[in-house]
Amino acid sequence: MNLEYVHVVQKFNQVLLELTKKVCTVVGGNKPTYWYHHIRRVCSECPSMPMSMIGPYLNVYKTQIVTKDKNFFMNFDPPAHNEYTFIIQKLKEAARNMPEDELEQYWAKLLFLLKSYIKCKPFIN
């Protein structure tokens, strides 16, 4: 297994758990491992998406989180990616109490990690 891939996955897991705890605290939950499981599952499926699609796809959702536009969000739900919907709904709940600058930092980190993870995915074989 490629060392770069291993390093990215380790970093990915570390930061993801940290960010998940943050979301969990904001939402008021007390089981970060629950959120971690779902977010990690979504991220593990990302390699099946074209790299060019990831950024625009997540950015549309980011816009909905920041603006809290429920109607548009509910109409933008690609059937092939229902797991994303679950995660984004939870992030929207967190966004109600999270300052926008914190949310932006959270999203930027997660998007960067997703792209890094996808980029290194082919090295697993």
Curated annotation (Swiss-Prot):
A GO cellular-component term linked to this record: virion component
Subcellular location: Virion
Stimuli inducing this protein: Expressed in the late phase of the viral replicative cycle.
Superkingdom, natural source: Viruses
Keyword tags: Late protein, Virion
Chief subcellular location: virion
Assigned protein family: Belongs to the asfivirus H124R family.
Protein name: Uncharacterized protein H124R
Origin species: African swine fever virus (isolate Pig/Kenya/KEN-50/1950) (ASFV)
